[in-house]
Regions:
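Conserved structural motif at the start of ABC-family nucleotide-binding domains
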Residues: 20, 34-37, 146
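The feature captures the beta-strand-to-loop junction immediately N-terminal to the Walker
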Residues: 51-53
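Helix-to-loop junction immediately C-terminal to a conserved catalytic motif
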Residues: 66
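Conserved ABC transporter NBD signature motif
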Residues: 74-86
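Catalytic Walker B motif of ABC-type/P-loop ATPase nucleotide-binding domains
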Residues: 174-178
Length: 180
């Protein structure tokens, strides 16, 4: 299988299609809107940051783009298609507070989780996946910690491991929620 970025663009058949397009997005918690009428257009190849005070809805917007929270209204497109059809082209680094750091897993296992989109849930990772995970750990300077439990790392080290998990996906889009 080829590069997921070229796959997504080839499927659309349109050069220059937006990487992320959000139109009239509204998200509510218990019938109380927390985001409303949000529009966002992100071209391919752009580094972009969403900044704002605590409680402004940055995390909620990322989660809505990823389908982790349900939108009350609006549309989210990734390379011109619904996110459900484009999951494999999006890498995600969550906020530290949303992860169970006491879950008994190694650094290498966490990074290999980034390969499950390509593998599927029923196939076990093999040598190729381990090599890709180790290469991603090397990119973030964490290869020496591969066999260590994720709970034994500092907060910054944990974030670098989750960055490696996103990188191992070879995604066309990376969404990072307070990555540093």
């Amino acid at each position: 299988m080829g590069d997921p970025r070229s796959l997504a663009l080839a499927v659309d058949g349109v050069a220059g299609v937006l990487a992320v397009e959000v139109t009239d997005l509204t998200v509510a918690y218990r019938d109380r809107p927390v985001l409303w009428d949000v529009d966002l257009s992100v071209p391919s190849g752009v580094l972009m940051a969403i900044i704002g005070p605590n409680g402004a809805g940055k995390t909620t917007m990322i989660k809505a783009i990823l389908g982790l929270v349900r939108a009350a209204a609006g549309q989210v497109l990734i390379y011109g298609r619904p996110y459900t059809e484009q999951r494999r082209v999006v890498g995600y680094v969550p906020q530290r507070g949303t992860v169970d750091w006491d879950f008994p897993t190694t650094v290498l296992d966490v990074v290999m989780m980034g390969r499950y989109g390509e593998l599927g849930w029923l196939r076990r990772p093999g040598k190729k996946e381990r090599e890709a995970a180790m290469q991603a750990l090397e990119q973030v300077g964490m290869e020496a910690f591969a066999k260590r439990q994720i709970s034994q790392l500092s907060g910054g080290q944990q974030q670098r491991v989750f960055l490696a998990r996103a990188l191992v996906q070879n995604a066309g889009i990376y969404l990072m929620d307070e990555p540093f």
